[in-house]
């Protein structure tokens, strides 16, 4: 059974690329045609790449590997969090802090600080042992740390793979993963350079439905790898979005 159907890809608008004038020539082999100034992605090639990515991601999970989901743009934030949590993996959906992979020891200290502040707050110590001003400053610090690090709070080491929604926006995590030899799975729209992507998935990275569908397929691969569940259905739902890309 295919991990996703052509019908699902069409309904989610996976085939709508960016304006032709914004294209990256390196994406030419994945483009089917141009329609009304918009590049149309070849879904037959997308389907093949999705299946390749699914199988590799399934193997990583089966071997006990950990995956980091990355998507900080508005259209991706919800799907990234939902699907990472569903598959028991980690995520960054607010802001990528430089060095999250290449300087993970420092990031880990920030996570420890976050947990320390959480403990002080939960036990009421912030209110009993500190002034109101100090407590307010600590809570402000905790809020900022939680926003950026809550999705990786239990990540003990750099992940075995990362999954990225927008390669252009998430240029830094892609480069950090590449430097460390961590495989990169990513949705690649018609305006990106796919060279640093280990397992590229040609797809519309602007439409919410497209992002949710592809991200759910990746999560399904992890779930199957972890639990041996077969025939996992990709999650897609009707969302009122523009057919074309935002730019």
From Swiss-Prot:
Keywords: Ribonucleoprotein, Ribosomal protein. GO terms for cellular component: cytosolic small ribosomal subunit. Pfam families: Ribosomal_S2. This is Small ribosomal subunit protein uS2. PROSITE patterns: RIBOSOMAL_S2_1. Signal peptide: none annotated. HAMAP family: Ribosomal_uS2_B (MF_00291_B). NCBIfam families: rpsB_bact. One of its GO terms (biological process) is translation. Disulfide bonds: none annotated. It comes from Fusobacterium nucleatum subsp. nucleatum (strain ATCC 25586 / DSM 15643 / BCRC 10681 / CIP 101130 / JCM 8532 / KCTC 2640 / LMG 13131 / VPI 4355). CDD domains: RPS2 (cd01425). GO terms for molecular function: structural constituent of ribosome. The lineage of its organism: Bacteria, Fusobacteriati, Fusobacteriota, Fusobacteriia, Fusobacteriales. Coiled coil: none annotated. Belongs to the universal ribosomal protein uS2 family.
